[in-house]
């Protein structure tokens, strides 16, 4: 017997639904174009704390490996700290950052706004949660259709219709479980490991490493021409990286 599935990380911009996917040559390669997503997770059990630690690639609405901005981490460094950048609807530039306690700052004035982002990356105005309309998908008249379905869900900076949006690049998120996967903490984004002007590395999906000889955890990731190992010696509280070039050409 099996229990009901538990999602360690989940977005609600699109309905959780079963879709009959056509198998004909014309439609079988159709792709949903507007959803935020998680992909390529990797998991390990930390013997020191007993926690299960899961990392995954995070993609904003409509973004994947092929179209992610490779020259932007999505973060801004201020006084040695990295803060998530946001662009407001109607703006051409990313003029806002998410600072301590989730307060959204206007970078032009360096002053707080009336907006905040909570630990789920949802947007609030004056402490009140904002919403967007959820999407559903179906096939109609020989094409894939993505349509609003009338259900309001909390606005999230990774969503297509959010008032504030993150940079269209790839990120890495981490979540932990204290009960071997029965329930999970809210995910948090890891800081950039390759600087402000480089997108995040991509996780090698599957399993991380917990070394027997120490409390070290290691997750393998990759970027163009390079392997980058994410390392934690404190049960995932902090991370550092160690990179190695790939000894052959045309590798990603």
Residue positions per predicted region:
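Asp-box/BNR beta-propeller blade signature and adjacent active/binding-site loops
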Residues: 1-252
């Amino acid at each position: 017997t099996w229990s009901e599935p538990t999602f360690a990380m989940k977005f609600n911009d699109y309905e959780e639904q079963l879709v009959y996917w056509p198998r004909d040559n014309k439609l079988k390669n159709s792709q949903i174009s507007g959803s935020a997503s998680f992909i390529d997770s990797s998991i390990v059990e930390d013997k020191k704390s007993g926690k299960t630690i899961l990392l995954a690639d995070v993609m904003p609405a409509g973004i994947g490996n092929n179209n992610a901005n490779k020259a932007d981490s999505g973060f801004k460094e201020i006084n040695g700290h990295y803060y998530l950048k946001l662009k407001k609807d109607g703006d051409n530039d990313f003029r806002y950052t998410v600072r301590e306690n989730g307060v959204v700052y206007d970078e032009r004035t360096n002053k707080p706004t009336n907006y905040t982002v909570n630990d789920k990356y949802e947007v609030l105005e004056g402490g009140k949660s904002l919403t967007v309309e959820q999407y559903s998908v179906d096939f109609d008249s020989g094409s894939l259709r993505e349509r609003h379905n009338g259900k309001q869900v909390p606005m999230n900076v990774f969503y297509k219709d959010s008032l504030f949006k993150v940079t269209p690049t790839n990120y890495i998120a981490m979540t932990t479980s204290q009960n071997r996967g029965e329930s999970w903490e809210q995910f948090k984004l890891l800081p950039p490991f390759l600087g402000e002007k480089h997108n995040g590395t991509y996780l090698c999906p599957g399993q991380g490493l917990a070394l027997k000889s120490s409390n070290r955890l290691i997750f393998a990731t990759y970027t163009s021409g390079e392997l980058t190992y994410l390392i934690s010696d404190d049960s995932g509280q902090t991370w550092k990286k160690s990179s190695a070039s790939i000894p052959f050409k045309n590798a990603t």
